[in-house]
Structures are given as structure tokens and as C-alpha cells.
């Protein structure tokens, strides 16, 4: 994902803090502890950490460059030498094979972190105290990007052949609420408030959605088309006379 606008260093944005009471979170102790530590840091420091890891001159780009040039002999793979235990060594080696395959230095290989919970992937990618090697963090980052990409593809599909956007704005808010503070730090200032305003407008037009499950959980079970076709089962109430009046004013 391309780095977005930086948050103002002088502004304290409460939306960066993790709210454990919002739906859709798979809160492990490790994830909560990481989120708590990051919440105590200023936004400017979080942005610096994000840039050092994922920026254009960050560790992941450096690793990719070395893998293309040197393959298995890349200097950034030296931390594998300190691993002990067959299980740890095996996982790291699978991550190496995946990364080498991505850079055409080996046949393509499966990502060993594919299918993990987003929160668990975040703990590997963004926790500097983690015992995982750089190449494992890289592979986990790729799994995280794939996870988010698949989610957004499904979310965008709910906007096809319909004028209303309640599902997509619910989904955008849900995704943002799941992010670690370091991930939120590169979003535009007041991003959440803007998306909430869009959702409020949509629900004024079409009625409030009452969801007993997160959008992500629904999209794991049902197709975007199914959600659109069954919106009425999630609607609290719709005053169609009022909707018609609002839409008439908008047309004018």
C-alpha cells in the first residue's frame, strides 16, 4: 500500500488508539500489548518507524534489492544463523524460499504465513521485540498485504450496480479500527471522522444497518452480491417518504 499523508506531529489523534470494544477485533494478548506500547508513542515517531521498515529506503526494500542481486547470499539473511530449533529454522527457511521465489531467484513457493489472522501477522511485522527474522517479517508483511487486498476487492464489489454505499463505509471503518497505531499513523488526518460522516449520510438516506457480525466475517461467508441482495435483513428501519424527499433535494 502506498504511504499516505503524514499526520501532523503537533496533533494528538485519539482515533489512532485501539478501541477494544469496537467489533471485528481478534484481540490476542500479544496484539493488545503491542497496540498499547505504540499508543504511547508520538505520531511522528510511529511514522519514522513505519518509514524505516516499509518506506522507499526501508528494511523491506533493502531486503528485496539484496535478494534480487545476491539470492540466498543476501546480507540481510544473516540473522537466520542465530536461529535454534528445527521448527524455527524450518519456518524461516520457508519464508526465505517464498521471498526468493518472489524475486525470481527460486521457483515460486507458498507463503508460510498465508491464512493467519491479521492481528497475528501484525505482531510479526510491526513488533521490533519479535524474535522473527527480517525475511519472516517480510513474508508476513506480504501475507498482510494480500489479506487486505482480498478484503478491499470484496468491499468494492458491494458498490457495483447500486447507488448506496453503506456496506463499503462500514467496511472501511471496521478495517481502520483493526489497524495498529503504526499503521494508522500514515493515514490522512481525521480519516476516520470523514468515513464516519459518509456512513452517517448514507444511513440518513437508506436507513441504519444493524450488523450482528463484522463486515469482514460476513464477506468470508457470503459473496458481495449476497450482501447486497439481503440488505433488508440488516436494516433497522427506512422512512421511504423521507428518503424520496432527501433524494429530490439532492437532485435539485
Residue ranges of predicted features:
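Type III/flagellar secretion export determinants
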Residues: 1-252
Amino acid at each position: 500500500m502506498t504511504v499516505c499523508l503524514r499526520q501532523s506531529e503537533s496533533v494528538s489523534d485519539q482515533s489512532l488508539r485501539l478501541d477494544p470494544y469496537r467489533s471485528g477485533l481478534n484481540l490476542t494478548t500479544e496484539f493488545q500489548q503491542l497496540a498499547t506500547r505504540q499508543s504511547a508513542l508520538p505520531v511522528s515517531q510511529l511514522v519514522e518507524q513505519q518509514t524505516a521498515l516499509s518506506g522507499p529506503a526501508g528494511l523491506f526494500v533493502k531486503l528485496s534489492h539484496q535478494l534480487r542481486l545476491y539470492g540466498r547470499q543476501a546480507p540481510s539473511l544473516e540473522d537466520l544463523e542465530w536461529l535454534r530449533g528445527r521448527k524455527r529454522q524450518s519456518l524461516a527457511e520457508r519464508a526465505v524460499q517464498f521471498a526468493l521465489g518472489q524475486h525470481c531467484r527460486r521457483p515460486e513457493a507458498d507463503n508460510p504465513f498465508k491464512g493467519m489472522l491479521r492481528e497475528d501477522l501484525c505482531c510479526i511485522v510491526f513488533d521490533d521485540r519479535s524474535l522473527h527474522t527480517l525475511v519472516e517479517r517480510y513474508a508476513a508483511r506480504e501475507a498482510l498485504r494480500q489479506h487486505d487486498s482480498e478484503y478491499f476487492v470484496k468491499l468494492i464489489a458491494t458498490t457495483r450496480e447500486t447507488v448506496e454505499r453503506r456496506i463499503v463505509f462500514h467496511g472501511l471503518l471496521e478495517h481502520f479500527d483493526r489497524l495498529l497505531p503504526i499503521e494508522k499513523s500514515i493515514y490522512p488526518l481525521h480519516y476516520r471522522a470523514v468515513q464516519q460522516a459518509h456512513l452517517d449520510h448514507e444511513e440518513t438516506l437508506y436507513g441504519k444497518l444493524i450488523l450482528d457480525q463484522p463486515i469482514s466475517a460476513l464477506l468470508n461467508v457470503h459473496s458481495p452480491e449476497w450482501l447486497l441482495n439481503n440488505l433488508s435483513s440488516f436494516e433497522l428501519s427506512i422512512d421511504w417518504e423521507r428518503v424520496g424527499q432527501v433524494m429530490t433535494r439532492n437532485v435539485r
